[in-house]
Amino acid sequence: MPHIQPPILSQVPVIAAVCEPAIALTKERQSLKIEGSVTSKNFAMTGVAGYIAPRHLKAIVDTGSRLVAAMDPHDAVGILDRYSFDVRFFTEFERFDRHLEKLRRGPSGDRIDFLTVCSPNYLHDAHIRLALRIGADAICEKPLVINPWNLDALVELERETGRRVHTVLQLRLHPSLVALKQRLGASEHRHTVSLTYVTSRGRWYDVSWKGSADRSGGIATNIGIHFFDLLLWLFGPVTDSEVHLSDSGRMAGHLELERATVRWFLSTDRGDLPFAPQPGGKTTYRSITIDGEEVEFTEGFTDLHTQVYERVLAGEGFGIADARPSIELAYQIRHAKVTAPRISPHPLLA
């Protein structure tokens, strides 16, 4: 293991004084003007009945666009009426596909410009391919794919169709985290990081697609992918990785990144919460510490999806190359053998 110098926080004010640049960045994004925004873009969506879909529905409307068609095998989609009474809705993928193809062959003003993918993880790349095939860009929730080699086919399809695949890496736009990255970038010191994320789930979770590693990618992908992307974005690529715990509901390990040593712990087990959860109450605990100091970013999430859409429409969205490192890391973690820790493990394993 390489020698790790003790962190010197006084030389790197990582956590403190982030407000001023964060506010400036927020104002900059809020003032971002989308060229050509006078022309409303046509959107379609898969997975419109799902948990994350409302954030995308709001982002579509907030950016002056309109949803013209949506699909989900579940028909509890009354939320559509908050935004439009005219959305064509389908419960069968084949009929949805046929409708989008009909629009593609019709007047140019009716064609789909963007297909938003909010479906289960294992369907993401298939629905992205639909977008590219009908001449639309795709905006896809994390992860773009479960297995990293499927990214290569999407890169080829981008080249063949001239369309783009965009992913949603909204934490990279969070003002406090943007300011934190700027401050970290000014230092050559290595940092000691602890990541703890416990989001308790009931018995339904194991029955749903989310509880199936083949369909969700397991918890490293399903609940960990956005944190792994954040860590790689802040501290650079992986140089070493260990997995100390791996089962269907809990994973933990150690990462050596270019500029940090990371101990991480992910869980859907309510027994790992530092408090006693109650149905309908708080059921999630999230903590990231850098050199022993907590990173505070519990606020500021309300319009991050809208900011993602603004940047996509301005030609500045996150693409396949941005998503690849965290997808590869989550895949490696999912398939890694459990080993004894070579350094002190995460505190919840100690």
Which functions belong to the PLM regions below?
Residues 203-272, 324-328:
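Rossmann-like dinucleotide-binding domain that binds NAD(P)(H)
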Residues 19, 25-37, 102-107, 114-116, ...:
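C-terminal helix-rich "cap/oligomerization" subdomain common to oxidoreductases
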Residues 122, 145-203:
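A contiguous active-site-proximal alpha/beta segment in oxidoreductase catalytic domains
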Residues 248-304:
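C-terminal substrate-binding/catalytic lobe of Rossmann-fold NAD(P)-dependent oxidoreductases
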Residues 19, 25-86:
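N-terminal Rossmann-like dinucleotide-binding module
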